[in-house]
Amino acid sequence: MSFLHPWRCGAQSAVALLALAGVCAAADPAALPAFRPSEPENQVAFEKLYNLDYDTAIQGFEKVLARHPNDAFALNHLLSAILVRELYRTGAMNTGEYANDSFVGQVHRPPDPAQKERIKQLVQQALKLEDAELSHNANNVDMLYARGVTRAQFALYTGLIERAWFSALRNAVGARHDHERVLELSPQYQDAKLVVGTHNYVMGSLPMWVKVAVALVGLSGDREKGIKYLVDAGRANGETSVDADIVLLVFLRREHRYAEALEITHALSPRFSRNYLVALEEGNLLRASGKNREAEEQYRRVWQNGRDGKYGNLHYEMAALGLGDLLRSEKNYASAAAAYDLVADVSAPDPELLQKANLAAGEMYDQMQKRDLAMKKYEAVVSTNSSNGQAEKARQRMKEAYRE
């Protein structure tokens, strides 16, 4: 989770959760836990990663790996950064997609073939190193932990990028077994509770008939145990502490435990003020808990921070969509349309977000019986991308005015 390093969790696709992770901009490097290998550049790279500055983070991890070519932790850190950058680029990190009964998010843009090959190459390199060390000492807890991290990340890759679910499950189970063994050998190795806790929660949340089926192959889960393990990992101030908090945040939202989830966002936001995903999730949680006015204020705050340049070129326009959806739910159609229209004010909005905003704005104008404005919005949807689901809906609206 880094978020991933929720990414690092790898339990099927739950790990993709929200990549709210990459947290940090104004974070004090001294406040971060010690990452292995221990050297200043590693700390700086993690600060950039948590800051969602993936390119700079990757450059830093490349330098660390060049100085420590046989360090499994250095390999995994670089792998994490490249993987989460690709997940962010493909649009697989929308937290809302993990807040319902499905753990399977969507990849909205095709992955980069070169990045896919780089990820697989790093996985193979790390596993070769880890397996070699474990062949000499099967109880080497650091190598067991490192291999579990590699397997978890590969599970995330195969699940969310390759969409190969059986391979993802196999690697996720392997990661869990490695980290359970770590905890058997060294109960105080709290970092291992991230993967084990995530896997327990995911398995414990499956429908009963699926639980029975997976139990036949020796798999089980316990939602409360999973949450407890994530709390333990978050409080340990280890490598996975922030990651554990972010995964926990998503799971608490699924459990409708909004007050507890908000406590996490309140703790993370001041530390990691450039991570707009954390700030945006706070708005989502406020709305889910029925605090609409506070949610509206938060969405507007995120939007204004983005306009003021606090998030760089990250896609903070998601806040305008969230604001529009909230106002729409209150049947405040004029204000909702105005919020959706804000997305187009961003210099380079995400094309899919822009399509969603234009489609929603068109529907609001139809509700207000402003058909000419609605038609312009639907035409804009089709002109952005004429071959996806949003365009199909827009063409339907062009034939018949939308009504709620």
PLM regions and their residue ranges:
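Terminal, low-structured helical/coil segments at or just beyond the last alpha-helical repeat
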Residues: 235, 239, 367, 371-404
